[in-house]
Amino acid sequence: METKGRRSAAVLDQQDESEAHPRKRPTRRAPLHRDGNNPDSDAATMEGSDPGSAGRPSSDSLLQEPSQPAKRGGLLDRDAIEHITELWDRLELLQQTLSKMPMADGLKPLKNFSSLQELLSLGGERLLTDLVRENIHVREMMNEVAPLLREDGSCRSLNYHLQPVIGVIYGPTGCGKSQLLRNLLSSQLITPAPETVFFIAPQVDMIPPSELKAWEMQICEGNYAPGPQGTFIPQSGTLRPKFIKMAYDDLTQEHNYDVSDPRNVFARAAAHGPIAIIMDECMENLGGHKGVSKFFHAFPSKLHDKFPKCTGYTVLVVLHNMNPRRDLGGNIANLKIQSKMHIISPRMHPSQLNRFVNTYTKGLPVAISLLLKDIVQHHALRPCYDWVIYNTTPEQEALQWSHLHPRDGLMPMYLNIQSHLYRVLEKIHRVLNDRNRWSRAYRARKIK
């Protein structure tokens, strides 16, 4: 009994001592929370102060770093300045070109920074970030079209194996339409190379012998490509393509529409490989009553289905007038609707050229449409036998409008990129307009 009483008294003395000194706690106490994975390990209590914190801090304690100001994301690092500089050069060139056009009077003037240094210093974080993003997008558009171009920047082909190839050539007399037709085949701009070429004329006797010989030589030239060690590689299944001259009346015979008729000359040629039909000087015949529009839409699909070797079908038609009045059978109207390529000489009448540009540039800004008209007018003053080509179904959007030059080749105009750059100029114009409006409002309130 004495032992039990002494123990209870000792416990009471410890409780009184802890109540008298609330800062002092027993060195060992059951923890409030234990580790679920290690329930037997001793954990430090959550109640009271740490007796070790009063002295020297332990070497294992973590020191918090002082708060740093928020970083701005490297806005004007080297890459950002490179993007802005590259975009500024393009914007400045486009704006100078638009301002010097003869038709620039109707365009609204766009405000811009006077120099690159002013843009970098006064542009602001949001505008500069947008410009970096816009230039990245321009680079992406350039990289998308790069695989379709040669090393010198010219196009590898007109159709890039798109079938069928229905093309219309517009040009006045003496602009080089016949030479253009031969060049398209000899330079392999139309792929695949045809194995049989049908030359359609109003009368066979009106074709001069020199032109026939030129056709035979150039289609044979287009059938080969240079290979390694001075060799030549055939581009089709024949060593010598066939050249067949036909009169327009023979073309329109009924048996030439039926692919199952053994008398069909086109079906016999398509059984061996790709074919091409060239209609030169046939505008008056096309404007007659007899319809030949089957050659533009129904006939190609029938040939492709019946003859697997006919991997290419090309029809090129020459017109001296972009809007002929005589079209009794609707052949010319159907031809222009089904056409995949419109090849235009800059020497055409300006009113017809402007009407065509206005029709096929509805989705472009007005300034870019005027720029295209100025380009055509510029080449019309220089008789270089060059051509402007509009592709209704291009392989890439940058190739929709292109320029064919005897020396430079087929060069894309990149009107989609020019339209994008013009919209960037409009964005800068809106930013500067907003700043001027805010400045005027601030001054007006300050005066009041």
From Swiss-Prot:
Places the protein is found: Virion; Host nucleus, Host nucleoplasm; Host nucleus, Host nucleolus
Region (DNA-binding): 440-448
Sorted UniProt keywords: Activator, ATP-binding, DNA-binding, Host nucleus, Nucleotide-binding, Phosphoprotein, Transcription, Transcription regulation, Viral genome packaging, Viral release from host cell, Virion
UniProt similarity note: Belongs to the adenoviridae packaging protein 1 family.
One function term, GO molecular function aspect: ATP hydrolysis activity
Name the record gives this protein: Packaging protein 1
Record's subunit section: Homodimer. Part of a genome packaging complex composed of packaging proteins 1, 2 and 3; this complex specifically binds to the packaging sequence on the left end of viral genomic DNA and performs packaging of the viral genome. Interacts with protein 33K.
UniProt: ATP binding residues: G171, P172, T173, G174, C175, G176, K177, S178
Cellular component terms (Gene Ontology): host cell nucleolus; host cell nucleoplasm; virion component
Keyword ATP-binding: yes
SMART domains reported for this sequence: AAA
Inducing stimuli: Expressed in the intermediate phase of the viral replicative cycle.
InterPro entries in UniProt: AAA+_ATPase, Adeno_IVa2, P-loop_NTPase
Function as written in the Swiss-Prot or TrEMBL entry: Component of the packaging machinery which encapsidates the viral DNA into preformed capsids and transcriptional activator of the viral major late promoter (MLP). Binds, along with packaging proteins 2 and 3, to the specific packaging sequence on the left end of viral genomic DNA and displays ATPase activity thereby providing the power stroke of the packaging machinery. The activity of packaging protein IVa2 is stimulated by protein 33K which acts as a terminase. May be the protein that pumps DNA into the capsid powered by ATP hydrolysis.
Comp. bias intervals (Polar residues): 56-67
Composition-biased stretches (Basic residues): 22-31
Pfam families: Adeno_IVa2
